[in-house]
């Protein structure tokens, strides 16, 4: 096949991140300079985000059997890149005090993982699916354990390595069964084969169903859905804040995109079984995640269980696609994921800012007790954190409310009555632990002898604080005036009249 400039433009995001990876790798080999490599990484992510605008204008988007750069994938590419950019900015301060000479490789691993995320968002082939899954997971083994001097980080890395290996084996075995049943690895070919009823053998239908089921189990591990969630709180607690952010945003978003695309391949006769499966997992994830978050005293563990619940909420949209192929499902999932990504960036950004100012290593910087009375020393930071937490809770006048409103309307319109009510009740439970965090900020302050005095008396503008301010403003603005967001989603997913 003749490769044209149009095809190169379609591949620009992944080519830019790939070239940035090579440049950073060669630069590290020549001379170690953390500021230079941070700047190169941020520039690469920013350029890749800008290049998505060029991809948007192209029409021949499905030019290879391996990948499919279409309207569906563009949103997820943007979210993966924004998450990678935010993680790069937040990591810089932490790497400045990192007690080792291997600081620069952090960005190398982050870039490679982002390539895997883009591949997952654009995959149209089971081989590329597995390649993207491994590319996004393998660098995370090192990134999660980057704080090797911290026992929690080592424990988190080991747990993630073991369970990620298990999930990859499920996905690979599922791919093998689907290939054995259909003889194809391309999503397009598999879809045509199944929809035209060319497979007449009950054995082949059974094998393809089991294969997809095993792949969904693997995706459940990656998405930390109940009952595949056991690694999540420990990994979020042990990993650096910037990597916890990356895990809860980019890693999950890429897997959600490939899950939706894969489920859309299979015809309607497969949907009933998987709807029941996803309904059970969604209910358990929403309820269990919120209940377990109530008794946590570590803010990272609270957000870990919160992410389990939020992933359960997203499954409303996935089920709506499977059950009735609702025309608003993709738009609803997109709006909810945008709100979730922005609020997660803000939450972990503030955690990163607060933890940086502790002078003693024996201080549990992620304890909720640390945030007690924060308003009386850092009122600006506390107000921003309040806005972000309210958005996570889905309180009106925030972007989180718009996302949940769309989800619940979609559930009702898809006639998922009891499921939507159950999810709404689970969401009410979450208000308890979110308000607990907010109230903690405004209580009487504690003795903060072990905190950098600059933190208690000044507000200096730094890149991580700029990100938190931008995110908080976006949450408020789009919560009060969501028309720009809805217009953006209509550009990606034109409404069906």
From Swiss-Prot:
<keyword id="KW-0813">Transport</keyword>
<dbReference type="GO" id="GO:0008137">
    <property type="term" value="F:NADH dehydrogenase (ubiquinone) activity"/>
</dbReference>
<dbReference type="GO" id="GO:0005886">
    <property type="term" value="C:plasma membrane"/>
</dbReference>
<feature type="transmembrane region" description="Helical">
    <location>
        <begin position="426"/>
        <end position="446"/>
    </location>
</feature>
<protein>
    <recommendedName>
        <fullName>NADH-quinone oxidoreductase subunit N</fullName>
        <ecNumber>7.1.1.-</ecNumber>
    </recommendedName>
</protein>
<feature type="transmembrane region" description="Helical">
    <location>
        <begin position="246"/>
        <end position="266"/>
    </location>
</feature>
<feature type="transmembrane region" description="Helical">
    <location>
        <begin position="466"/>
        <end position="486"/>
    </location>
</feature>
<feature type="transmembrane region" description="Helical">
    <location>
        <begin position="126"/>
        <end position="146"/>
    </location>
</feature>
<keyword id="KW-0472">Membrane</keyword>
<feature type="transmembrane region" description="Helical">
    <location>
        <begin position="8"/>
        <end position="28"/>
    </location>
</feature>
<feature type="transmembrane region" description="Helical">
    <location>
        <begin position="210"/>
        <end position="230"/>
    </location>
</feature>
<dbReference type="InterPro" id="IPR010096">
    <property type="entry name" value="NADH-Q_OxRdtase_suN/2"/>
</dbReference>
<dbReference type="InterPro" id="IPR001750">
    <property type="entry name" value="ND/Mrp_TM"/>
</dbReference>
<keyword id="KW-0874">Quinone</keyword>
<feature type="transmembrane region" description="Helical">
    <location>
        <begin position="35"/>
        <end position="55"/>
    </location>
</feature>
<keyword id="KW-0520">NAD</keyword>
<keyword id="KW-0830">Ubiquinone</keyword>
<keyword id="KW-1003">Cell membrane</keyword>
<comment type="subunit">
    <text>NDH-1 is composed of 13 different subunits. Subunits NuoA, H, J, K, L, M, N constitute the membrane sector of the complex.</text>
</comment>
<dbReference type="GO" id="GO:0042773">
    <property type="term" value="P:ATP synthesis coupled electron transport"/>
</dbReference>
<feature type="transmembrane region" description="Helical">
    <location>
        <begin position="72"/>
        <end position="92"/>
    </location>
</feature>
<keyword id="KW-1133">Transmembrane helix</keyword>
<keyword id="KW-0997">Cell inner membrane</keyword>
<keyword id="KW-1278">Translocase</keyword>
<feature type="transmembrane region" description="Helical">
    <location>
        <begin position="170"/>
        <end position="190"/>
    </location>
</feature>
<feature type="transmembrane region" description="Helical">
    <location>
        <begin position="383"/>
        <end position="403"/>
    </location>
</feature>
<dbReference type="GO" id="GO:0048038">
    <property type="term" value="F:quinone binding"/>
</dbReference>
<feature type="transmembrane region" description="Helical">
    <location>
        <begin position="274"/>
        <end position="294"/>
    </location>
</feature>
<feature type="transmembrane region" description="Helical">
    <location>
        <begin position="105"/>
        <end position="125"/>
    </location>
</feature>
<comment type="similarity">
    <text>Belongs to the complex I subunit 2 family.</text>
</comment>
<dbReference type="Pfam" id="PF00361">
    <property type="entry name" value="Proton_antipo_M"/>
</dbReference>
<feature type="transmembrane region" description="Helical">
    <location>
        <begin position="302"/>
        <end position="322"/>
    </location>
</feature>
<dbReference type="GO" id="GO:0050136">
    <property type="term" value="F:NADH:ubiquinone reductase (non-electrogenic) activity"/>
</dbReference>
<feature type="transmembrane region" description="Helical">
    <location>
        <begin position="333"/>
        <end position="353"/>
    </location>
</feature>
<keyword id="KW-0812">Transmembrane</keyword>
<comment type="function">
    <text>NDH-1 shuttles electrons from NADH, via FMN and iron-sulfur (Fe-S) centers, to quinones in the respiratory chain. The immediate electron acceptor for the enzyme in this species is believed to be ubiquinone. Couples the redox reaction to proton translocation (for every two electrons transferred, four hydrogen ions are translocated across the cytoplasmic membrane), and thus conserves the redox energy in a proton gradient.</text>
</comment>
